[in-house]
């Protein structure tokens, strides 16, 4: 990814999108066991900063920062960055239960460990709702029982499926797990709560959201009072020059 070559805006947007998609796929493969939950790319004039979101940041960093240095070297070589022009950081996910990617990975490991599908899905569903989500949906499809493939859907709370608010409120993650009977597909959708501080959810309210303002408490007067204020006494004229002549 050479930033020195002049390219059109259209090609630049496409190039940035491909770079982020390939980087996300690479980190998903490398950090699958470390709770990888997404990546954010910040481009500055001097260098490119890559923030890796994960639930186990200590494992991403490695002993004395060895792992993060190895990842930096691999990304630098893969995407043709100059030395010192790229920097990788690890950031801990604020609310693990509200991250669809983290919960999809958690469900994948539960199914790999031999836990029953229904029990594993209900465990993930309960954990997401206890973390403060407005709603969630878990779909597992494949050869669940017998040789015929089918899908099981588990839903709790409120979930929106269309409209622009989906882009802000709904997080989606898809994963695949290879079991003895075949490959199972996992899809997790989490609807985030409204948060004016923009920490665990979007600060933009839903279009149909109605907020009721509590009325102010009225002051109870025990004795008659008046709001009439006595005007201050007029200032005496010490100097005749201040007097106005009619």
UniProtKB/Swiss-Prot annotation:
Q: Where is the KH type-2 domain?
A: 23-94
Residue positions of the PTM Phosphoserine?
Answer: 241
Coiled-coil residues: none
Q: Which UniProt keywords apply?
A: Cytoplasm, DNA damage, DNA repair, Endonuclease, Hydrolase, Nuclease, Nucleus, Phosphoprotein, Ribonucleoprotein, Ribosomal protein, RNA-binding
Looking at the UniProt record for this protein, which Gene Ontology cellular component terms does it annotate, in alphabetical order? cytosolic ribosome; cytosolic small ribosomal subunit; nuclear matrix; nucleus
A GO molecular function annotation here is:
oxidized purine DNA binding
Residues modified as Phosphothreonine: 223, 226
Mark out the compositionally biased spans (Basic and acidic residues). 214-228, 236-246
Report the subcellular localization. Answer: Cytoplasm; Nucleus
GO terms (BP aspect) = cytoplasmic translation; DNA repair; mitotic cell cycle; negative regulation of neuron apoptotic process; positive regulation of apoptotic signaling pathway
User: CDD domains under this entry?
Assistant: KH-II_40S_S3
Q: Name one Pfam family in it.
A: KH_2
Q: What are the boundaries of the region Disordered?
A: 201-246
InterPro entries given in the database record: KH_dom-like_a/b, KH_dom_type_2, KH_sf_prok-type, Ribosomal_S3_C_sf, Ribosomal_uS3_C, Ribosomal_uS3_CS, Ribosomal_uS3_euk/arc
Which protein family is it in?
Belongs to the universal ribosomal protein uS3 family.
Concerning NCBIfam families, the annotation shows: PRK04191.1, uS3_euk_arch
PANTHER family listed in its UniProt record: 30S/40S RIBOSOMAL PROTEIN S3 (PTHR11760), SMALL RIBOSOMAL SUBUNIT PROTEIN US3 (PTHR11760:SF32)
Subunit text = Interacts with LTV1; the interaction is RNA-independent.
Q: What does this protein do?
A: Has DNA repair activity directed towards the mutagenic lesions 8-oxoguanine and abasic sites in DNA. It can cleave DNA containing 8-oxoguanine residues efficiently. Also acts as an ap lyase, cleaving phosphodiester bonds via a beta,delta elimination reaction.
Q: What is this protein called?
A: Small ribosomal subunit protein uS3
> Which organism is this protein's natural source?
Drosophila melanogaster
């Amino acid at each position: 990814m050479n930033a020195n070559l002049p390219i059109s805006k259209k090609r630049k947007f496409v190039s940035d999108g491909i770079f982020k998609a390939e980087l996300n796929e690479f980190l998903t493969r490398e950090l699958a066991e470390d709770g990888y939950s997404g990546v954010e790319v910040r481009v500055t004039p001097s260098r490119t900063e890559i923030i890796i979101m994960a639930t186990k940041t200590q494992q991403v960093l490695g002993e004395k920062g060895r792992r993060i240095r190895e990842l930096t070297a691999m990304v630098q070589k893969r995407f043709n960055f100059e030395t010192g022009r790229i920097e990788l950081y690890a950031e801990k996910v604020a609310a693990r239960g509200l991250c669809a990617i983290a919960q999809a990975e958690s469900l994948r490991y539960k199914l790999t460990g031999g836990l029953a599908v229904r029990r594993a899905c209900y465990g993930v569903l309960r954990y997401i709702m206890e973390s403060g989500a407005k709603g969630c949906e878990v779909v597992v499809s494949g050869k669940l029982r017998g040789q015929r493939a089918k899908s099981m859907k588990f839903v709790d709370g409120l979930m929106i499926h269309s409209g622009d608010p989906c882009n802000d409120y709904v997080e989606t993650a898809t994963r695949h797990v290879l079991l003895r009977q075949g490959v199972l597909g996992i899809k997790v959708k989490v609807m985030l709560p409204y948060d004016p501080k923009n920490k665990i959810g979007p600060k933009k309210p839903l279009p149909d959201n109605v907020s009721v303002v509590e009325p102010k408490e009225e002051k109870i007067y025990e004795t008659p009072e008046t709001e009439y204020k006595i005007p201050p006494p007029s200032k005496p004229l010490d100097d005749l020059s201040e007097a106005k002549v009619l």
